[in-house]
């Protein structure tokens, strides 16, 4: 069972290419020091997988934390390249828990996953650059639901109308 008060979730763009890996690592270490023990990844390419890999690396180094892979539907990785699929499967194999929300793809599968992430955490670490899509949805939902938010994106010119 996930204790949301000690749980962090991640959201970020699929275009993430490691730009904030060190800041991400530092954020995870700091959050563990603050008492967060469980980290949720939605397992999408880009920031989600990078965040999951950081959690796993820290766990290998002896940091006491858990990774929960939250998969929107069985077979999510089928459309990935061979290299991306291998990376995804390594993370799933090393995760402390795997939660699959649906047996097959359906319209809204990613939104259901994003809602799950927000409703099971109290802290959200994002790589959000202000563009529309699932990351924006999750970021704004986290804001609306009162999660503590940390945005690692260097893009600082977020449209303030998003927060009104």
Please state what every model-predicted region is.
Residues 1-164:
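Acidic/glycine-enriched connector segments
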